[in-house]
């Protein structure tokens, strides 16, 4: 089994690319953020986050798909629990044991985050809009900070990884970058 983990801030294109990739890959399954994220947006309990991820990995072991396309995983949990990625090293080891793993970090140019969030809010459900509280400006600042932390995590991950800039929404080019890895 091959695992492709998408990380990135809200509105970076994770769902779009996951669906496009699943259409191209035979016998693939998308694991949504509804399955991978703990219910609390700010969970500072690193032990609970790691335990939650371990349980998910146990579920993944039973999966028969050739490709698991995962929407957010340990980088997001490390960010939300204010942990270092080192504290999630056992999770990375377990992911490697499952099979070939690729971590794909999607980014948006910092100057474009506010506009992308605003655009995304126009078509997302009300529940998504409530996810990050505050004004549009405050949300943009929060997501810019999250993106910078995710980039720092990407630099120290032990998993094979790539960063893809999705500012221009060139989804075909993004798919090519993933396929070339």
Where do the PLM segments sit?
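Hydrophobic anchor at the beta1->P-loop junction of P-loop NTPases
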Residues: 6
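P-loop (Walker A) phosphate-binding loop of NTP-binding proteins
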Residues: 9
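Conserved lysine of the Walker
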Residues: 14
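Loop/turn-to-beta-strand initiation segments
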Residues: 64-68, 99-102
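Charged helix-capping and loop-helix junction motifs
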Residues: 84-91
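NTP-dependent small-molecule kinase module
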Residues: 144-181
């Amino acid at each position: 089994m091959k695992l492709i983990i998408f990380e990135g801030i809200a509105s970076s294109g994770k769902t779009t690319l996951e669906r496009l990739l699943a259409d191209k890959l035979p016998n693939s399954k998308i694991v949504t953020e509804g399955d991978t994220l703990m219910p609390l947006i700010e969970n500072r309990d690193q032990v609970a986050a790691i335990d939650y991820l371990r349980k998910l990995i146990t579920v993944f072991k039973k999966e028969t798909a050739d490709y698991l396309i995962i929407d957010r995983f340990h980088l997001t949990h490390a960010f939300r629990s204010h942990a270092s990625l080192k504290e999630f090293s056992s999770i990375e080891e377990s992911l490697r044991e499952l099979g070939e793993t690729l971590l794909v970090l999607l980014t948006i140019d910092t100057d474009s985050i506010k506009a992308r969030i605003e655009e995304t809010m126009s078509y997302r459900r009300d529940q998504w809009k409530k996810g990050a509280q505050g004004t549009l400006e405050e949300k943009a600042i929060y997501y810019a900070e999250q993106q910078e932390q995710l980039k720092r995590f990407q630099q120290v991950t032990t998993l094979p990884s790539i960063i893809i800039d999705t500012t221009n929404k060139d989804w075909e080019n993004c798919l090519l970058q993933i396929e070339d890895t």
